[in-house]
Amino acid sequence: MKGKFLIVFGLFFCLVLGMFTGCGQKEEEARVYYLNYKPEAADTWEEIAKAYEAETGIQVRILTAASGSYEQTLKSEIAKQMPPTLFQINGPVDYEKWKNYCRDLSDTQLYSWLIEPDMAVKNEKGVYGIPYVVEGYGIIYNDDIMQKYFSLSTRKTDFESMDDVNNFDKLRSLVEDMSCHLEELGIEGVFASTSFSEGEDWRWHTHLLNLPVYYEFSQKGVADEEELDFSYEENFKNIFDLYINNSCTDCKELASKTVDDSMEEFATGKTAMVQNGNWAWNQIARIDGNQVKAEDVKFLPIYTGVSGEEKQGLCIGTESYICVNSIASEADQQASIAFLEWLYGSETGKKYVTDSLGFISPFNTFSYEESPNDPLARQVVSYMSDSSRKTVNWDFTTFPSQRFKVEFGNSLYAYCKGETDWEKVVESMKQSWASEKALLLEDGKENK
């Protein structure tokens, strides 16, 4: 009887021990949970998650926030017992809101793969946001029209190709001479309309302003400023004046023009140049009456007259930074890093990035052939990979607020119409920057 009791007790003990051991193993299973920003990519991320699970056995949960609700969704999800292990921020300003949840990624392969390490969101303590997709912008030109210009016997410049145009002085002489030959070139203006319809001026108050801000930050060796000197304001004025004075649309009529109008003017051959990014190719190709061939759509850096700009590249950056949740378990953090390194390092993952997500990758694990198959994206990759060129970072992610951008855009249009002088534009911009940055600091103190 005693022997039977010992056998039964032994079996019971093993069963209980097995249950607790099993539970312990289950609790230690690593998980990956990605809070996706873009609804249009939701299905693709689900496919990626299934492919990763099939290959590794690790489950990846994907939750996609509704359009315009990412921050609200992140606040809700990150407070839960099983929060996202991967989430997105849009730059240094956003990092300040979420820095208590961002793991240092400086020791990861993912960070070491970055072609431009300075693109990461980082400080003296570590790396906290890694760009997972990049885009680039500059001056898009129609090389077919440019070749017509270079063949003119009456032109005043001696450029043989756009390769010879590598600073602002050369660009200005080219553009101003082209404006004297509009009829011969069959165009209505060198540049497409400098759009100032409501909400359509982001190319100037954000993308163009990025250049003087980038150069000021670089000169001072800083990543942000509470007060901006706007020390490169003359350089901004150089290129902005060139745009508005050599456009197909009179300065006083720009309030009626949209970005779509500008792209149509370029696509239909009415103009030779337009400032925009690689995302514009799909728009150009779809426009009714498009006359621009893929092989003729090319990029030129936005030259403004800064010393040494002959080596300047395109403005390349992102508003999409991936972060690993530092309050997740260490196992979950490591699993999430492994997932990202599979996505951007394995053949299977890279194919999803290029073919399904359509991303230009910021990592050196991708070859030129593994970039999206459109002419502008390919040129962004080419500029990124050219070690002789210095990429202009997207420092506009540090701009203090949307209100700052709107106010600067309004000042620019008043300048276009002759209702204010340039000095007032500069002073207004500096005051707006300082006041909006001060509000950010106050908000930061309240959120602590």
Kindly give the residue locations of the regions a language model identified.
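Extracytoplasmic/periplasmic solute-binding protein
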Residues: 124, 128-132, 137, 169-225
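Extracytoplasmic/periplasmic substrate-recognition and gating elements
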Residues: 55, 59-60, 248, 289-359
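Short, solvent-exposed loop/beta-turn-alpha elements that line the ligand-binding surface or hinge
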Residues: 106-114, 157-163, 195-198, 213-238, ...
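Glycine-centered hinge/linker elements that transmit conformational signals in sensory
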Residues: 172-176, 220-257
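Conserved C-terminal helix/tail region of periplasmic/extracytoplasmic solute-binding proteins
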Residues: 59, 347-350, 361-363, 367-371, ...
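Hinge/lid segment of periplasmic solute-binding proteins
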Residues: 89-147, 296-303, 323, 373
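Conserved N-terminal structural module of periplasmic/extracytoplasmic solute-binding proteins
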Residues: 5-8, 18-94, 107-110, 153-154, ...
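Short helix-initiation/N-cap motifs at beta->coil->alpha
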Residues: 64-73, 165-170, 253-268
